[in-house]
């Protein structure tokens, strides 16, 4: 993948904003503590960054996690979500805040795009919280970043005056992955896998992203998360998410997962489909 990637795009990755110091401190502590991680120490590191602490509490009380009572302390957040998920959430949130967003090169309305990105994360939570809360907690940060590649690609295309050519090619081909590979040497989902690896995200998250298009080929440990993201990717595809074709493809993926020994509740998925998909 990286061998085919546009060289200028690779260079632009080198100057992406660094992650906050708090994330570096958390990572360093977890790495040094190994299995002897203390909740109080993690809370102490997070509490040294009031903005991050406030955002974590806000996210913990959002619909993403569906807790029935209000979460009021960082210790509660750490106990309920686990240190690994906390680090993923903090990283995902700080990354999202670092980018100027203009997705006009894709022919998309930026406000609608942002709304859909939030709906993706909410969908993962609503769909999986009842049947696999652990998987839901793992995938919410990933869903928050699922379209980050589109944001970075858009900025790159605009800066290099290729945005109009890209959109013309996209409109003509009606094939998003083809257009991205033609102009950038990689599609936005594969590029996200590359970025998560570069930022040292959790290995399971990285692998889940890398197998979104081929979940059946993922190793057993990540197969269920890869299928969950693949289903979400179909339902919220940037240009034709929730179309009759994509809604049927999402259900077909769930049935395919069953042949791989991965069980999702079909009725639960059907009841949690986005409204547009239900209409179809």
Model-derived segments and spans:
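Conserved alpha-helical "signature site"
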Residues: 1-145, 151-159, 183-185, 190-245
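Cytosolic terminal low-complexity segments enriched in Ser/Thr and acidic residues
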Residues: 247-250, 256
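Terminal helices and disordered tails flanking the catalytic cores of nucleotide-processing hydrolases
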Residues: 1-8, 256-280
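Divalent-cation-assisted or electrostatically stabilized phosphate/pyrophosphate-binding catalytic cores
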Residues: 76, 163-191, 218-226, 254-264
């Amino acid at each position: 993948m990286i061998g085919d990637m546009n060289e200028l795009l690779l260079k632009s990755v080198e100057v992406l904003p660094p992650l906050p110091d708090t994330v570096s401190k958390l990572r360093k502590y977890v790495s040094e503590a190994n299995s002897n991680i203390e909740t109080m120490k993690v809370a102490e590191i997070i509490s040294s960054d009031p903005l991050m602490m406030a955002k974590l509490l806000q996210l913990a009380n959002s619909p993403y996690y569906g807790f029935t009572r209000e979460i009021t302390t960082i210790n509660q957040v750490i106990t309920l979500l686990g240190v690994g998920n906390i680090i993923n959430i903090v990283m995902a949130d700080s990354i999202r805040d670092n980018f100027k967003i203009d997705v006009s090169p894709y022919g998309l309305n930026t406000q609608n795009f942002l709304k859909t990105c939030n709906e993706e994360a909410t969908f993962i939570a609503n769909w999986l919280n009842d049947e696999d809360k652990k998987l839901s907690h793992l995938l919410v940060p990933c869903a928050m970043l699922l379209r980050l590649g589109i944001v970075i690609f858009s900025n790159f295309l605009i800066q290099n005056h290729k945005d109009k050519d890209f959109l013309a090619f996209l409109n003509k081909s009606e094939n998003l992955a083809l257009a991205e590979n033609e102009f950038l040497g990689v599609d936005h989902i594969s590029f996200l896998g590359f970025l998560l690896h570069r930022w040292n995200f959790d290995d399971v998250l990285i692998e889940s992203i890398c197998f979104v298009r081929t979940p059946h080929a993922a190793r057993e440990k990540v197969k269920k998360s890869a299928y969950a993201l693949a289903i979400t990717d179909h339902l919220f595809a940037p240009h034709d998410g929730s179309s009759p074709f994509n809604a049927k493809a999402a259900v077909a993926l769930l049935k395919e997962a069953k042949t791989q020994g991965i069980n999702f509740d079909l009725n639960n998925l059907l009841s949690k489909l986005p409204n547009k998909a239900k209409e179809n």
